[in-house]
């Protein structure tokens, strides 16, 4: 009879008195020697995804800083003289554009950053969060585009018909905001919340949360939606911008072609002729600003919508087309439009800033000196001082008295003053 306390018949058991850490130890008793999985931090995503988030953060900070500066400059400077109703209308449109850029950058960049950093919402709030995010993105993009087109239209009417009927800026600005919200409703119904499966090894918080509904549908559904988005968000504003900027360029070209007439040699026959009308320098600056805003809108939004249309007509399956690398990169370029718009305004309209005047004066010294030397060399042969020009010749009234007796001609009047240097501030 065997001893019941023999070591040969005792079942091997773990020493329960010793604390064990199964999550960080190796299972040496297993045949394959596999490690027991322990708690690990969630993956952080690919480097391109992190770079995308960094660029979105930089653009968001730049957009908030620039547009806040524009709003403080236009809304807070009430201590100066009243600039007049026309300037008030232009300032009102610029304030609306700055507010639209703030709304667009916050709706696009801030919503994406919050979505990626905070992680997946609850399933009950997933669809609502997706639709609200797309509503903010589409409406902000549309409001900014509509106000850029409205500014170009207002400048076109102010240049072509200065004394004509004024544009109802407040009503059209309210209509632009309302139209942007209405046209942004369809994008809210083409997305749904879909959390990634838990078995996915390379899933990070916020990955593929909002997906389109076009994966199980035929391809033409996605193509129709892409066409609608391109026409409403890009083609229609570009058509209005092309009409307004085309008229602006025509007026600018006509007024510029009449300007060389003023530089022709002075003759007595031109004494009674009136000089051609030219655009004021401040109006030229606002015209240039409108053209720059239009070109910036086209340059920033054209690659994004081209990538969207290319993804819709590609041979790839219509899955998560919102998350393609090219479309995501073009979205960053589109959001950059909201950060560059205030810089354009500050470049063209900051003429009364003391630092800006010093910078323009320092940069314009060289070209001003060259223009003055050219004018002096051109007029040196036939231009003298006024008293030397008159003495010892008789004065004008003496010449008029002697015209009938001696038949002498009236001395020509002095030449007009040369135009100011082009480097001087327009303000």
Swiss-Prot record:
Question: Which key words are in the record?
Answer: Cell membrane, G-protein coupled receptor, Membrane, Receptor, Transducer, Transmembrane, Transmembrane helix
Indicate where this protein resides in the cell: Cell membrane
Where in this protein does the record put region Disordered? 402-427
> Which Gene3D superfamilies does the entry mention?
Rhodopsin 7-helix transmembrane proteins
Q: Where is the composition biased (Pro residues)?
A: 410-421
Q: From the UniProt record, report the name of the gene that encodes this protein.
A: Gpr150
Instruction: Name the InterPro entries for this protein.
Output: GPCR_Rhodpsn, GPCR_Rhodpsn_7TM
What is the taxonomic lineage of the source species? Eukaryota, Metazoa, Chordata, Craniata, Vertebrata
Query: Which regions span the lipid bilayer?
Result: 4-24, 51-71, 90-110, 171-191, 231-251, 287-307, 328-348
According to UniProt, the name of this protein is Probable G-protein coupled receptor 150
Task: Give residue spans on the Cytoplasmic membrane side.
Answer: 25-50, 111-170, 252-286, 349-427
User: Which family, according to UniProt?
Assistant: Belongs to the G-protein coupled receptor 1 family.
């Amino acid at each position: 009879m065997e001893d019941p306390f023999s070591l040969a018949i005792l079942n091997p058991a773990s020493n329960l008195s010793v604390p064990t850490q199964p999550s960080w130890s190796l299972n040496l008793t297993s045949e394959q020697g596999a490690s027991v999985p322990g708690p690990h931090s969630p993956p952080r995503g690919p480097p391109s995804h992190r770079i995308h988030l960094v660029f979105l953060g930089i653009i968001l900070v730049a957009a908030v800083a620039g547009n806040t500066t524009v709003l403080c400059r236009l809304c807070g400077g009430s201590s100066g003289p009243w600039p007049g109703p026309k300037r008030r209308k232009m300032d009102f449109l610029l304030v609306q554009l700055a507010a639209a850029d703030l709304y667009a950058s916050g709706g696009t960049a801030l919503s994406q950053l919050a979505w990626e950093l905070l992680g997946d919402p609850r399933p009950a709030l997933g669809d609502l969060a997706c639709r609200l995010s797309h509503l903010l993105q589409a409406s902000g993009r549309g409001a900014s585009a509509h106000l850029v087109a409205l500014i170009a239209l207002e400048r076109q009417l102010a240049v072509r018909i200065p004394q004509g009927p004024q544009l109802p800026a407040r009503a059209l600005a309210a209509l632009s905001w309302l139209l942007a919200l209405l046209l942004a409703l369809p994008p809210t119904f083409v997305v749904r919340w879909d959390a990634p499966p838990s078995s996915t090894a390379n899933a990070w918080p916020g990955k593929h949360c909002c997906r389109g509904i076009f994966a199980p549908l035929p391809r033409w559904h996605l193509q129709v939606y892409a066409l609608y988005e391109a026409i409403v968000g890009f083609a229609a504003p570009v058509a209005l911008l092309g009409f307004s900027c085309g008229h602006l360029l025509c007026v600018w070209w006509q007024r510029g072609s009449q300007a060389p007439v003023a530089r022709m040699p002075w003759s007595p026959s031109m004494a009674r002729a009136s000089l051609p009308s030219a655009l004021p320098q401040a109006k030229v600056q606002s015209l240039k600003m409108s053209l720059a805003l239009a070109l910036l809108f086209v340059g920033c939004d054209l690659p994004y919508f081209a990538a969207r249309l290319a993804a819709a007509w590609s041979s790839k399956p219509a899955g998560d087309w919102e998350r393609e690398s090219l479309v995501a990169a073009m979205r960053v370029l589109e959001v950059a439009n909201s950060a560059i718009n205030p810089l354009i305004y500050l470049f063209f309209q900051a003429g009364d800033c003391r630092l800006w005047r010093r910078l323009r004066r320092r940069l314009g010294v060289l070209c001003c000196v060259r223009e003055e030397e050219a004018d002096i060399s051109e007029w040196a042969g036939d231009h003298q001082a006024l008293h030397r020009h008159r003495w010892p010749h008789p004065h004008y009234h003496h010449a008029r008295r002697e015209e009938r007796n001696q038949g002498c001609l009236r001395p020509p009047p002095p030449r007009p003053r040369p135009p100011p240097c082009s480097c001087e501030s327009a303000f």
